[in-house]
């Protein structure tokens, strides 16, 4: 049964990465103006990354998200093959925006005198995982397993494309409530994946690994696995396990909800204090708790379609 489901999910894993040299998006200055192509709607959110608005593509009424990033807030820059200097986020999104459905797609981008504007896909209806958990509490393990599998596949896809997200958390995961599909969003803290050590980190501290807290050094893959462990705990317990630096470096995990022993084992494995003790993506996927995963559409039918939105806490 698991094999058939894995085969059904194989299209996610086998999705190719975009070749930056086959550049499909022309530099912003060569395109029609933003205002003639997109209708800007209400503000969806804002923060250190800039502001994100809902929008509509005029040509076909496609819902989009329109992200404005001020140039003076951009700390990491990249370069396209044609020499255009752009935020690293654009480079990373172009590398991962392919046929794979588990990562948000960059549809277009524009450069303005003092900012960049990114046009991203926007599923409807949609809710981020943070709000989903806040409204409904800790997830049933069957639902958490389906969600976690999809996030793991998204992170694997990014790594296969040479991209390290560096801010895996519930707020950066969108749930398509009709299809049961998850999408990893916000690559503003990301970097090109490398085998050597990283000495910078702009992600969310409570999801960061103990080696970063203690030594300001970490390796990309093992740090990603730590963040995945935090995320899985969040799913099955309804909140993150650690709030303060001293809790992160101690790494003592206490379960506030009734969680199966297999799920507890996987979480504790991902949250091993020594990076070398953490599992690989393949070991996570082969873990006993990860077997018999629901397909996204089944997840939607069983767990999402029957639920009506409840008031936020």
From Swiss-Prot:
Pfam annotation, one family: Pkinase
GO cellular component: cytoplasm; cytosol; nucleolus; nucleoplasm; nucleus; plasma membrane
Catalyzed reactions per annotation: L-seryl-[protein] + ATP = O-phospho-L-seryl-[protein] + ADP + H(+); L-threonyl-[protein] + ATP = O-phospho-L-threonyl-[protein] + ADP + H(+)
UniProt superkingdom: Eukaryota
Key words of the record: Apoptosis, ATP-binding, Cell cycle, Cell membrane, Cytoplasm, Kinase, Magnesium, Membrane, Metal-binding, Nucleotide-binding, Nucleus, Phosphoprotein, Proto-oncogene, Serine/threonine-protein kinase, Transferase, Ubl conjugation
Posttranslational mods: Autophosphorylated on both serine/threonine and tyrosine residues. Phosphorylated. Interaction with PPP2CA promotes dephosphorylation.
UniProt-recorded Gene Ontology molecular function terms: ATP binding; manganese ion binding; protein serine kinase activity; protein serine/threonine kinase activity; ribosomal small subunit binding
Record bears the keyword Cell membrane: yes
Domain Protein kinase: residue ranges: 38-290
Subcellular location: Cytoplasm; Nucleus; Cell membrane
Chain sites annotated for binding ATP: 44-52, 67, 121, 128
UniProt cofactor(s): Mg(2+)
EC number(s) stated in the UniProt entry for this protein: 2.7.11.1
One biological process term in Gene Ontology: positive regulation of cardiac muscle cell proliferation
UniProt xrefs under PANTHER family: SERINE/THREONINE-PROTEIN KINASE PIM (PTHR22984), SERINE_THREONINE-PROTEIN KINASE PIM-1 (PTHR22984:SF29)
Family assignment from sequence similarity: Belongs to the protein kinase superfamily. CAMK Ser/Thr protein kinase family. PIM subfamily.
Subunit record text: Interacts with RP9. Interacts with HSP90AA1, this interaction stabilizes PIM1 protein levels. Interacts (ubiquitinated form) with HSP70 and promotes its proteasomal degradation.
Protein name in UniProt: Serine/threonine-protein kinase pim-1
Source organism of the structure: Rattus norvegicus (Rat)
Phylogenetic lineage: Eukaryota, Metazoa, Chordata, Craniata, Vertebrata
Gene symbol of the encoding locus: Pim1
């Amino acid at each position: 049964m698991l094999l058939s489901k894995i085969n059904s999910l194989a299209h996610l894993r086998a999705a190719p990465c975009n070749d930056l040299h086959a550049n499909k998006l022309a530099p912003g200055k060569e395109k029609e103006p933003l205002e003639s192509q997109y209708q800007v709607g209400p503000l969806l959110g804002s923060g250190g990354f800039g502001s994100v608005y809902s929008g509509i593509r005029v040509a076909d009424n496609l819902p989009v998200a329109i992200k404005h990033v001020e140039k003076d807030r951009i700390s990491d820059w990249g370069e396209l093959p044609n020499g255009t200097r752009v935020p690293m986020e654009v480079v990373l999104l172009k590398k991962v925006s392919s046929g794979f459905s588990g990562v948000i797609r960059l549809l277009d981008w524009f450069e303005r005198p003092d900012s960049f504007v990114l046009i991203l896909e926007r599923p409807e209806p949609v809710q981020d995982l943070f709000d989903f958990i806040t409204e409904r509490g800790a997830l049933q393990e069957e639902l958490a397993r389906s969600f976690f599998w999809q996030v793991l596949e998204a992170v694997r896809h990014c790594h296969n494309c040479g991209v390290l997200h560096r801010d895996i958390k519930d707020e950066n995961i969108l749930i398509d409530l009709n299809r049961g599909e998850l999408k990893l969003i916000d690559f503003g803290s990301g970097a090109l994946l490398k085998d050597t050590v990283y000495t910078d980190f702009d992600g969310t501290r409570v999801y960061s690994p103990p080696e970063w807290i203690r030594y300001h050094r970490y390796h990309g893959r093992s740090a990603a696995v730590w963040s995945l462990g935090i995320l899985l705990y969040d799913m099955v317990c309804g909140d993150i396990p650690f709030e303060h630096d001293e809790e992160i470096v101690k790494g003592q995990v206490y379960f506030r909800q009734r969680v199966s022993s297999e799920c507890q084992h996987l979480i504790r494995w991902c949250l091993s204090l020594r990076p070398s003790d953490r599992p690989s993506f393949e070991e996570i996927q082969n873990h006993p708790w990860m077997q018999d995963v629901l397909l996204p559409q089944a997840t939607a039918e069983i767990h999402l379609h029957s639920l009506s939105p409840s008031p936020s806490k």
